[in-house]
Amino acid sequence: MEYYYKPFEEINVFPKTFKDLLEAPCRVINLDRNPERWEIGEKKIINAGFTNYKRVSAVDAKNNKQLDEGWNILGNPKFADWDKEFKEYPGKQGCFLSHFKIWKEIIDNKIPYMVILEDDVIFHPKWKELAPEYFDNTPKNFDVLYLGAQFEFNSKFHIDIGPVFCTHAMVVTYNGAKKLWEMLLNRKLGVYTIDCMIIDSMKHRLMTMNNENSLFKSNPFTWYVWNGNFYPTEIKNMPKDWTKRNSGLVFQDESFGSEVREW
């Protein structure tokens, strides 16, 4: 069955306060060959208030051995034929495997929740003022919380549920990691670009949530997204169509370029 995850013993522990979130385990994805991105990103992460962060070596798509090892861990799933870019741009595979690497850490160690950031993050200038308010108003039952994202729907709310792209700033719970792991690896057509797989899971959940026979009825995949568009700022405006990625309170820095694909 597609979009399926087996029943498991959940860990229903969530950050209760914004301070809890800032003190939560935080992993920052960074390639070994990009130390300058880490140096810059680390300063931003410290300034944002995160105190329990740790750099994680990203799976380098330019290293075939790392790719092979990563796919072996996942059982060498087939690639979806329709996503030509997933094969054409191995950086997409590296991104996929890097996030699975962190989800595996969460699952193996039964970590209740973890902040996952990519090294090109930029925080909204009013992050310290806005983020605590957003967090206080976020329901504490999520599998995934998007601190930043690319909205694929018109939101009229500060905190919403809807399909989004991007993986640069997320909070993933143990329950979320378990669900994402299985939902993404059980696709009959194969795996493809990671945020495309996640957004398809979101759309499926929204379409089937009222179906009495749906898995999502009894054990839903639950996520929330922070909509920062109520607080415009010039720093979110970037070339190469990157501005659309910056709809939350955490943005992606276009000046670093992309290790995922050419732009």
Locate each region found by the language model.
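An acidic/histidine-cluster motif and surrounding catalytic segment
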Residues: 1-117, 121-263
